[in-house]
Amino acid sequence: MDGRCLHNIMYTGTYDEIMRAINIYEHRNYSSFRNLPLHYAIYSRRKDIVETLLKSGYDPNSVDITDNNCLQLLSMPFDITMLPVDEEVQDYAISFYLSKNMKHTSMLIPITKEALRGNRYPSEPYFSSMCRKFKDNELCIMDLLLRYGALPNSRKDGLLPLYHAAAAGNTEMVELLLSYGAKTNLHTRYEDSIFMCAIKSNNVKTAKIISDLYNYKNDINNILKTIQLYNADMLLFLIEIGLDINTKDKKGKTALHYACNSINCIETVKEIMKYGADINVKDREGLTPLHSACKYGDLKLSKLLIEYGADVKVKTTSTVLNLAVESGNVELVKFLIEKNPEFITSDYLSLSLAIRCKDINIVLLLLDAGMDVNSSKCISTPLHLGVILGNSNIVKLLLDHGANINAIDKYGETPLEAANKRINIDYAELYKSNRFIIKYLVFLSRYDYKIKNNIGFIKNMYIIDKDETLSCFRNMCETELDKISSIKIGQYSLYSLLASDNDVKEYICKNRQEITQKIIDNLKDIIIYRSFIEKYISRINI
């Protein structure tokens, strides 16, 4: 008999069938994996078989092929794929287990056995009795192993049995291991203490047993970092044993900071606030919990924190709006601006960040809210950034909102000049951005004669003149503008209407429909400046 057959029969066979299988295995494979029958019996929770094998000399401290000893096999999370059943039964067992909100994964064994018997919907009293018997059976197996000499503090790999039991919130198993001398001052490979394992289980009874033997203050940093894992009862327990909810770790962060760093933390935050958490506490970087919420783009959490009194105007290395912009949550950005309209005039960095993130929706939101499209408080203007970072759609958007194409940055370069000096750039996007800029440049030069004396304009024209492709497109723009200027709309040219419709408002108001139709009739050969004209038509017909 091979190991797989022996494993399967442990779950389905009678005592006699299993012992016959073990006898066959011992005669054929005993020298290779001497204690394998004991490991299988433990993992399948066959107390009767475990007791028989221990009496016959099987080693309670032996390890299996995964380097786990007998106590570890009994206390570690159960792997349902070890059960000799098909996927349909496995899926049922997992679904039923989750529906009961159970914490001990080994309960999958009796659930599966009941399913194989055809009892997939046991009554509540029957199910409760079944669980109680199974749990008692597990404890009896552990007691047998310990009485036959299993060492509670021994391991070759993995977690100690006490840590597995504490992490599962298995209070009875924890008590049994402690009674046999299990140590509480060791740590896991992840530096978790026994106390951390216990509180993560959210079983207050288990945590209390460990806390009586261990100083929780040794784990204060880890407790804060994992605060989002604890339910209301566990949080109350931590407060009762002395945890100050405003305690800071080495980074200056509190429990509220860490809670706001995680997803689905609304309820945790509400619980923390019950115990007097400082809503505007700053860490060593000057960041508040609201900064954390905005960093992860959590609109619901941000609203909750502000309801509790979080200061949206708090000054630090980054504003909450900066972080919200980087998160990409348009609704959060909109909400913060509504809460603090001063962001529009004081937070010049957010527009640059939105451009860096290439988030056209947030760029549009900030521009429509009134943020300065020509802000020069950074090294470069927003238009410089848009061109250099290679996003022609954002470049067009900035130009449509009045970006100054002749602006000079701190290095003395215009957007066109700066972008065309770059080597590491998306040339397809640069090509489109160049055309947008030249289109606006040529249009402006037609009606603003003073612009020709502007140093930025001179620089731009120099860049265009020395590049054959750019010069060619400029000439195309000039030709199309000549055509637009030749189109007569009443006593005005179409170009004069586009360039200065404020001067002819009365004429436009009286002849709106006629003007619109006349323009539409002449759109056929207009390509480069078609968007200008369509925008003009929309504007006069509002």
UniProtKB/Swiss-Prot annotation:
This is Putative ankyrin repeat protein FPV115. ANK repeats lie at residues 33-62, 157-186, 218-247, 251-281, 285-314, 316-345, 347-375, 378-407. It holds the Pfam family Ank_2. Keywords: ANK repeat, Repeat. It comes from the Viruses.
